[in-house]
Amino acid sequence: VYFMTGTDEHGQKIEEKALAANKTPQAFVDEVAGVIRGLFDLMNTSYDKFIRTTDPYHELQVQKMFKKLYEQGDIYKSEYEGWYCTACESFYTETQLKDGACPDCGGPVHKAKEESYFFKLSNYADRLIKHIEEHPDFIQPESRKNEMINNFIKPGLQDLAVSRTSFKWGIPVDFDPKHVVYVWIDALSNYITGIGYDADGNHEERFKEFWPADLHLIGKDILRFHTIYWPIMLMALDIPLPKQVFGHPWLLVGEGKMSKSKGNVIYADDLVKLFGVDAVRYLMLHEMPFAQDGTLTYDIMVERINSDLANILGNLVNRTLAMTNKYNGGIVTNAKVSGEFDQELIDLALSTPKKVSDHMDRLRVQDSIDDIFDLLKRCNKYIDETAPWALAKDEANKDR
């Protein structure tokens, strides 16, 4: 297993925030990347590679890929005029706007006109649809696959702007340096540059070993970029596609998204101070369903910790250890003895690992956790049914 994560560090939004903070863009992203890595460490989250899109190797490969796509006719220079959302780093047509605002984040858009290089997405639309049809698990969950096909691919793909001239914080197009490579090629390509892809074919061993990736695990709000733009770019570069792209749902606060303006953002370090790392990790995994958005509030978190971790798991561990220390000197005198309640528990214990594994293979983490806690609840019930404290005093049933 090779697990890679990292930070997308270029773009107009970062350039503007760095200016507002009176810092250079590089100093600004260095600081932010440090904070993000600190959060991974805080949450005991391990990874094999933390890639930054300001890494020199990544920048060099992006320039080489851009030039290769241009030279083979997949990219051409033209001019773009439309509406631009800085927050989403995306262009939109008039008809795509929602009540005059960004259709994705609801934020403000402004009229933009600039020279740009464009990627001919439409040249690969039929090939992409064919790939999706022949690989039914390529986009998951199923509802998101249908959304991508029916809402974006089949209506027709517009050519994609892949360079910008209105800001400077980006990777320069080496043969036309007034342009910087836009996020679609810059950020998305980190998945292959991070494991040693080389546009000239001199790949590192890690790329040969780990690509194509078994899984891209991403937020549902960026699924379009990872299931349309990214696969088409790989097709154009003659690189195998990842085996699956999974768009996970959001964790909502109450019924709405977290928003700094609403003051409802829940921060990981605050949660760790309140509940501890392991409890927070459990909460994040359990409250994130497979397809629907999850809901997280402080009341839900307290209730979940009390009911699951304290009453079910904690109670089982406490009762088991206490009775082990109290009775028979902690020794099982006859492991083969059984009673009327044993077989049901044995069957459940034997079947649970496969159920957990099957659910994890399909990324149904919440269901896997529920499988485990079904077993824990049955163990607690077994203790109530068999009453070891009574058996220990009954000489005839002492082996039980």
Feature locations, PLM:
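N-terminal, positively charged nucleic-acid-binding surface of large information/translation enzymes
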Residues: V1-I139
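Structured secondary-structure scaffolds
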Residues: V1-T5, R52, Y57-Q61, A112-K326, ...
